[in-house]
């Protein structure tokens, strides 16, 4: 009798159901896709997603030990091609590997956004080159290199930093004074000096500073590799280390840094990769709603 019972339990464990879903089979460069795993039994350990030789841990959805998700960034400079996505998980110490294909396609980003600024903001002096490099290193140390392994959003959907007209989309190729220098790493909102800016979700302020290009900027950690940041601000109403709630006033818009006029530059980094913040918001909120 004991042997029969043991065999029954073993058979149930071996044939447990695991469903894996990808949000996209075709995905634009500069955006984000999601992987969701659902199991009818507790896994031996948290599953992982392997993409382009990088391992991304999957995290529980709302604390459930049977539902996991991961958001994976597609670098803006990714080539148009098929890529492998591997999901690994353990059941009864058996390592299972599942492979999927996604196709990277080029987004319909604007290719000739012309911007005129002072010459010194395009061709930097040695002093400003040193300054810019030092600023980047500070941000990398305090923001880009960090991954908080738990959810700071408290399972809350993202909102927008303000209600205003979008004047420049993520991904646009930017031509400064006649030369293509970069692509737009965020979304610009029309905002006169002094317009209120709100945190797009719960999180922790990890850095506030003045940067050569971005001017006054706030970085907020939302956990699990996601950081939002708000640039060209006039003033800060929060400080480093402070917890903020979604919709909380964090400061006002300004005209600091390399700009042609006052506005808010809103951006998001996921695992140290800039992604379209509005597409990420839409996807994050959709996954949160579908897998409650």
Q: Model-found features: residue ranges?
A:
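Cationic-aromatic interfacial patches
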Residues: 17-110
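Short, surface-exposed secondary-structure boundary micro-motifs
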Residues: 38, 210, 248-249, 255
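Sec-dependent N-terminal signal peptides
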Residues: 3-14
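Zn2+-dependent peptidoglycan hydrolase active-site motif and core
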Residues: 185, 200-234, 262, 267
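Acidic, glycine-rich catalytic/binding loops that coordinate metals and/or anionic ligands
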Residues: 109-141, 145, 239-248, 267-292
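Surface-exposed, glycine-biased beta-strand/turn segments
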Residues: 99-214
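Short, well-structured beta-strand-loop connectors
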Residues: 196-206, 235-253
């Amino acid at each position: 009798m004991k042997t029969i019972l043991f065999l029954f339990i073993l058979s149930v464990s071996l044939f447990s159901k695991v469903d894996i879903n990808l949000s996209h089979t075709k995905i634009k460069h500069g955006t984000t896709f999601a992987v969701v795993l659902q199991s009818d039994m507790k896994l031996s350990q948290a599953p992982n997603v392997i993409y382009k030789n990088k391992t991304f841990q999957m995290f529980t959805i709302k604390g459930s030990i049977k539902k996991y998700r991961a958001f994976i960034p597609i670098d803006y400079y990714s080539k148009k091609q098929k890529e492998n996505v591997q999901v690994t998980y353990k059941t009864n110490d058996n390592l299972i590997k599942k492979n999927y294909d996604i196709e990277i396609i080029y987004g319909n980003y604007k290719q000739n956004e012309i911007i005129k600024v002072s010459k010194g903001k395009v061709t930097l002096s040695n002093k400003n080159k040193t300054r810019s490099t030092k600023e980047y290193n500070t941000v990398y140390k305090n923001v880009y290199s960090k991954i908080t392994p738990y959810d700071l959003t408290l399972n809350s959907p993202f909102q927008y930093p303000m209600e205003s007209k979008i004047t420049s989309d993520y991904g646009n190729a930017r031509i400064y004074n006649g030369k293509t220098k970069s692509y737009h790493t965020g979304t610009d909102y029309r905002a006169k000096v002094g317009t209120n800016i709100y945190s797009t979700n719960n999180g922790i302020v990890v850095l506030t500073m003045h940067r050569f290009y971005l001017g006054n900027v706030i970085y907020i950690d939302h956990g699990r590799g996601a950081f939002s940041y708000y640039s060209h601000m006039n003033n800060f109403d929060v400080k480093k280390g402070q917890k903020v709630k979604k919709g909380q006033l964090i400061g006002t818009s300004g005209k600091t840094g390399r700009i042609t006029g006052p506005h808010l530059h809103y951006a998001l980094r996921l695992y140290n990769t800039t992604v379209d913040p509005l597409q990420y918001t839409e996807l994050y909120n959709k996954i949160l709603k579908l897998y409650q």
